[in-house]
């Protein structure tokens, strides 16, 4: 793995090469993870938008393996924090440590000082520790004893969580949820995918040794930077901007919701649609780009009424209904 504070000079970093490299991520990650292509795409979109990702799924669906495979294929430094009920904020961000030899305090960086932080089972720790990530995610720095310390670039938090109905979980605060650009749901595999998983393990696949599985770096920070520059130049028409606003405003008027999408959420949807448009080979955004990213970008930014939940309404069903109702620009 590379030093997270340095650029990777081994990659050309021009937009055309960057797109090809990022597209090849799927093939590399598929060497370790069967299926889950939408989640892979979501992680790449988040990197392009300098955003963070929340991965939700039952235990055992390869959430952690997916993030580790992405880090290996991108040649990024990665660290993992297992969130537990007794985890302290300083265990994540770092702390001042007294050195008896010099009689001085020195800063010991926590695992947050990396390119890709895997926050495993983030909803198994109390809100105080969950909130220790807030400044890091929003400001891309950590302040300890009044001194701000910048985090490396790129920096992405990929947090995994179990569904809230599982015992021993603490629902993420709204302020924390809003810091995630995307919420990706990891489904159980199809029958054929599950057969493929078992076959790989029977043939000796070791999820702890991705190099042996053939996962190799195919892109680096220079490619990401070139891609981000190209995404920022992706054209957005006034009609597309209006379409995004109309979708988000419709959530605020939905009778099934107590909380709709904020302007920050609308900004996030436009950003992810631009990244998706660029990834698919266009330099302009179309309505289908907005639709493609609406669910992962918005599902964690709305709140259902209790009576709607009792009737079986879900966040995804509300968003899908809104997408079907809001006029699409021509």
Name every feature range the model reports, one short phrase each.
Residues 57, 120-121, 132:
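Walker B catalytic acidic pair
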Residues 42-45, 98-118, 147:
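Conserved alpha-helical scaffold flanking the Walker A/P-loop in AAA+ ATPase domains
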Residues 99-104, 125, 137-234, 274-276:
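Canonical AAA+ ATPase core
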Residues 47-84:
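Walker A/P-loop
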Residues 2-12, 16, 68, 251-330:
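C-terminal engagement/docking regions of AAA+ P-loop ATPases
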Residues 51-53, 77, 113-117, 131, ...:
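Loop/turn-to-beta-strand initiation segments
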């Amino acid at each position: 793995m590379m030093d997270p504070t340095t650029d990777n000079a081994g990659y050309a970093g021009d937009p055309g090469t960057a797109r090809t490299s990022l597209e090849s991520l799927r093939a590399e990650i598929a060497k370790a993870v069967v299926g889950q292509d939408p989640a892979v795409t979501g992680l790449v979109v988040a990197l392009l938008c300098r955003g963070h990702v929340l991965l939700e799924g039952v235990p055992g669906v390869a959430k952690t393996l997916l993030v580790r495979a992405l880090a290996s294929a991108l040649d990024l430094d990665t660290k993992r924090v297992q969130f537990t009920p007794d985890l302290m904020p300083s265990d994540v961000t770092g702390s001042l440590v007294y050195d008896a030899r010099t009689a001085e305090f020195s800063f010991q960086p926590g695992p947050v000082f990396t390119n890709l932080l895997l926050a495993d089972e983030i909803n198994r720790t109390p809100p105080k520790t969950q909130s220790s990530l807030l400044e890091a995610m929003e400001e891309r720095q950590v302040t300890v004893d009044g001194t701000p310390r910048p985090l490396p670039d790129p920096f992405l938090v990929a947090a995994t969580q179990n569904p809230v109905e599982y015992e021993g979980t603490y629902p993420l605060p709204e302020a924390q949820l809003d810091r995630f650009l995307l919420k990706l749901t990891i489904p159980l595999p199809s029958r054929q995918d599950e057969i493929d998983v078992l076959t790989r393990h029977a043939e000796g696949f070791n999820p702890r040794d991705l190099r042996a599985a053939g996962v190799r770096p195919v892109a680096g920070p220079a490619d990401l930077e070139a891609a981000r520059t190209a995404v920022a130049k992706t054209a957005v028409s006034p009609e597309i901007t209006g379409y995004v606003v109309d979708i988000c405003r419709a959530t605020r008027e939905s009778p099934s919701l107590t909380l709709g999408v904020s302007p920050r959420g609308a900004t996030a949807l436009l950003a992810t649609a631009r990244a998706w448009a660029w990834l698919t080979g266009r330099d302009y955004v179309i309505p289908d780009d907005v639709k493609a990213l609406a669910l992962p970008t918005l599902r964690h930014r709305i709140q259902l009424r209790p009576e709607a939940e009792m009737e079986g309404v879900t966040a995804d069903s509300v968003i899908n209904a809104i997408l079907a109702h809001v006029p699409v620009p021509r």
